[in-house]
């Protein structure tokens, strides 16, 4: 998992509430358990004018010019700004995979669906909860200023605007530790590999019948 420390990046606005996981990555693309390759189909039904299916050459598909993420000014964005209850619907882990593969490192919203929120942390994506008032202000600033960037410092738990205004966000110490060090659940387990191996060797000696066959 990629570590998250600090970024300064373009913000892309998605001015919609209750964006569900089927909108983030439609069900027809959930045929792989690899974490990569989902970016070209993120927001597929909004992003393209035709109906997408696995195996299509996305570079030849007609883009929807009215979809905000297709606008040239938001290309290369690594921060997604959106509205309340983002990531609702099914619990598919492909949703944060698709956002990560698209290039997003952080998502800012007034609220997130619980399962999606937890899945973000497991996949190196930082979900930031801000008040609706602050999110409203950010939408206005992003839309009024082309190339608008925010700076996120995870260690300090701060978000800084181009004008220098800084505000904080909440995150548990455990989740912050994992993101700062690029540790998913497997990585956390492997930190204790020596202890696990010692335990197994001790058990092999005391209960050898468990290891026969």
Curated annotation (Swiss-Prot):
Disulfide bonds: none annotated. GO terms for molecular function: 3-isopropylmalate dehydratase activity. Keywords: Amino-acid biosynthesis, Branched-chain amino acid biosynthesis, Leucine biosynthesis, Lyase. One of its GO terms (cellular component) is 3-isopropylmalate dehydratase complex. Its EC number is 4.2.1.33. Transmembrane segments: none annotated. The keyword Transport does not apply. It catalyses: (2R,3S)-3-isopropylmalate = (2S)-2-isopropylmalate. InterPro entries: 3-IsopropMal_deHydase_ssu, Aconitase/3IPM_dehydase_swvl, AconitaseA/IPMdHydase_ssu_swvl, IPMI_Swivel, LeuD. Pathway: Amino-acid biosynthesis; L-leucine biosynthesis; L-leucine from 3-methyl-2-oxobutanoate: step 2/4. The keyword Hydrolase does not apply. One of its GO terms (biological process) is L-leucine biosynthetic process. Heterodimer of LeuC and LeuD. HAMAP family: LeuD_type1. Catalyzes the isomerization between 2-isopropylmalate and 3-isopropylmalate, via the formation of 2-isopropylmaleate. Belongs to the LeuD family. LeuD type 1 subfamily. PANTHER family: 3-ISOPROPYLMALATE DEHYDRATASE SMALL SUBUNIT (PTHR43345:SF5), 3-ISOPROPYLMALATE DEHYDRATASE SMALL SUBUNIT 2-RELATED-RELATED (PTHR43345). This is 3-isopropylmalate dehydratase small subunit. It comes from Neisseria meningitidis serogroup B (strain ATCC BAA-335 / MC58). The gene is leuD.
